[in-house]
């Protein structure tokens, strides 16, 4: 066995406590911003395949055409992002045994491969159960839902996911859902939604109560698998992942967790809808192309976002900070984005629309940082317009410089405030420094932070296959 030693810097963890799962959610948050979504990829498929194994690994390119590569994931890190959110479907086409919620081994292997790409690039990963054909995010909140049966399916599913990924270090986070109460029903749905998505009444309170029942099942299932999962940071979702509804209705302290300070909250941001997502004019309003102060002089007022919308976003984020971050629950903005459009000459100028889009990404990122919220830009790999596509995956390049520059303008403006909320954590609290161990036996890890061998006094006395390992803070190459 030939051993080659080198300082482990390029792909090393930011903090040795990550390997020992010793960081709190707030300490981990220091390293995570900004984030990016591998959208329309691992969550793709058809819900006619729910609870079957008909999706296959080819589902990765069902909604966009590029297979994810190590080179591309490395480029995400080189471009300044520190985290990747991986939306994943498990039930929608990747279940081999419905009774036990067993996941197709080939699918698990492919998801692991992409997680490994991220670990090798020292990116933090948020791995979730996305809309997933609506099996729970819609069907679990209907008037006819068998809640007990859904809970048992959820417990089995997250037990299987957690066991498959339990050896990864603290750079891997689990998120129980995506947007609970949002999205389409599956073919198996019974009844209608139990609440009015646009109303606020007792039925909405009942919805939040049921949501937290499911979230408790998620937390308990992951913790029960033990190992690194006993202290892994977990992410729970606010109702509809909506700012206002989460601020008003979601009491995160109702969730219990055997691990102290290891919970984060998730919300999403596509507001205002008329600027970010509306595709065509309606009788109640028109698509907004420009932001106030960034519109051409000849633009119709009906095409310009009132600046009060910006103030409302900032206010809502600060309320989230008060209600959650200041109480020890960091927040991820799991998705945020606005459509970058092609503007007809009759509607104004393209340059002013581009400027407005950049401005939106800039202040959204900045305000998130100032509220202790970790933002993850949504990206679908749709290279046409309108889109929310930051990168061209096949070309391994930036697709939309306007959006990219807006994100990092906000990163620059908000970084000082963010670091004040989440200061750099100690590297020694809870662990001994490697150099203090002298000749004492220590552990060997692979580059993804997974334990390979423990109580190793000398590498000469342990059998390692060819590969790259971490031992006493150094990279070890076995050839």
What is the predicted role of each segment?
Residues 67-89, 319-324, 365-367, 374:
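Catalytic domains of carbohydrate-active enzymes, especially glycoside hydrolases
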């Amino acid at each position: 066995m030939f051993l080659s030693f080198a300082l482990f810097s390029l792909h090393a963890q930011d903090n040795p406590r990550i390997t020992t799962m010793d960081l709190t959610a707030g300490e981990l948050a220091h390293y995570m911003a900004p984030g990016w979504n591998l959208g329309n990829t691992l969550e793709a498929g058809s819900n006619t395949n729910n609870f079957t194994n008909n999706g296959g690994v080819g589902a990765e390119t069902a909604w966009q055409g590029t297979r994810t590569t190590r080179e591309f994931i490395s480029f995400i890190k080189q471009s300044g992002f520190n985290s990747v959110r991986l939306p994943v479907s498990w039930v929608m086409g990747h279940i081999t045994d419905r009774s036990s919620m067993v996941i197709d081994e080939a699918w698990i292997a492919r998801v692991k491969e992409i997680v490994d790409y991220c670990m090798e690039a020292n990116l933090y990963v948020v791995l979730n159960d996305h809309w997933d054909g609506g099996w729970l995010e819609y069907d679990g909140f209907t008037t006819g839902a068998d809640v007990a049966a859904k809970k048992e399916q959820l417990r089995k599913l997250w037990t299987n996911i957690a066991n498959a990924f339990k050896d990864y270090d603290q750079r891997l986070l689990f998120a129980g859902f995506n947007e609970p109460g949002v999205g389409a029903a599956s073919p198996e749905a019974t009844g209608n939604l139990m609440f009015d998505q646009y109303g606020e009444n007792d039925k909405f309170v009942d919805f939040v109560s049921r949501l937290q029942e499911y979230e408790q099942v998620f937390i308990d299932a992951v913790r029960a698998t033990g190992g690194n999962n006993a202290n892994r940071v977990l992410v729970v979702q606010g109702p509809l992942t909506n700012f206002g509804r989460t601020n008003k209705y979601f009491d995160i302290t109702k969730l219990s967790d055997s691990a102290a300070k290891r919970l984060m909250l998730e919300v999403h941001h596509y507001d205002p809808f008329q600027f970010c997502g509306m595709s065509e004019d309606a009788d109640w309003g028109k698509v907004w192309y420009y932001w106030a102060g960034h519109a051409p002089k000849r633009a119709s007022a009906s095409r310009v976002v009132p600046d009060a919308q910006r103030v409302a976003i900032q206010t809502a984020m600060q309320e989230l900070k008060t209600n959650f971050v200041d109480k020890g629950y960091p927040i991820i903005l799991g998705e945020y984005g606005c459509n970058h459009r092609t503007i007809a000459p009759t509607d104004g100028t393209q340059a002013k629309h581009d400027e407005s889009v950049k401005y939106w990404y800039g202040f959204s990122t900045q305000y998130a940082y100032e509220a202790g919220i970790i933002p993850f830009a949504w990206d679908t790999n749709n290279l046409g317009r309108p889109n929310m596509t930051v990168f061209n995956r096949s070309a391994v390049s930036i697709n939309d410089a306007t959006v990219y520059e807006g994100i990092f303008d906000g990163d620059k403006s908000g970084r000082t405030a963010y670091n004040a909320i989440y200061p750099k954590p100690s590297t020694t609290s809870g662990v001994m420094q490697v150099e203090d161990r002298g000749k004492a036996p220590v552990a060997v890890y692979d580059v993804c932070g997974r334990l390979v061998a423990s109580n190793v006094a000398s590498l000469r006395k342990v059998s390692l296959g060819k590969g790259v390992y971490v031992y006493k803070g150094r990279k070890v190459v076995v050839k």
